[in-house]
């Protein structure tokens, strides 16, 4: 899976392994009805001390990251993740994606982007997700939805 070689980057930063675009596509793709990555799969790509941040939480450590992913899957009837674009430059990667969550018969769609920073060992040491949590979550809810759309209109228009 990993090709062992050294890549020399600016400022004398050296990565001994490189995660490929295909590796990231595999991690960031999950059709409805398929299993989420296993703990072993996460451990292949994530540093033991990974820092994960998204609009709803911040975790530190691989076990906490895995628990956060497991909690998301357990809260939902099903989850999908579709990758649109991936870019890797030196020790930084970006993944553009769409996540779908089916909860109690309703589907919530979240377009987003992930920024990944790779450590010297080539594993992901920081994972930060950027997406709008409130609009897709509360937009479809009666009473809250119109209020959220009104509030957004005050900031965006």
List each language-model region with its residue ranges.
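A generic structural signal for ordered secondary structure
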Residues: 20-30, 69, 81, 112-114
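Short, Lys/Arg-enriched N-terminal segments with co-localized hydrophobic residues
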Residues: 1-14
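A solvent-exposed, acidic/Ser-Thr-rich amphipathic alpha-helical stretch
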Residues: 39-91
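Short acidic-aromatic low-complexity motifs
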Residues: 16-48
């Amino acid at each position: 899976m990993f090709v062992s070689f050294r890549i020399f980057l600016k400022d004398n930063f050296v990565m001994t392994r490189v995660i490929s675009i295909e590796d990231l596509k595999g991690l960031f793709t999950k059709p409805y009805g398929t299993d989420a990555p296993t703990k072993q799969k996460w451990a292949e790509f994530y540093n033991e001390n990974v820092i994960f941040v998204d609009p709803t939480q911040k975790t530190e450590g691989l076990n906490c990251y895995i628990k956060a992913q497991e909690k998301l899957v357990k809260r939902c009837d099903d989850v999908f993740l579709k990758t649109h674009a991936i870019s890797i430059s030196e020790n930084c990667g970006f993944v553009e994606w769409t996540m779908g969550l089916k909860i109690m018969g309703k589907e919530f769609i979240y377009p987003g982007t992930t920024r990944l920073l790779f450590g010297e060992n080539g594993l992901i040491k920081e994972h930060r997700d950027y997406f709008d949590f409130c609009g897709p979550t509360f937009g479809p809810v009666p009473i809250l939805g119109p209020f959220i759309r009104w509030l957004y209109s005050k900031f965006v228009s």
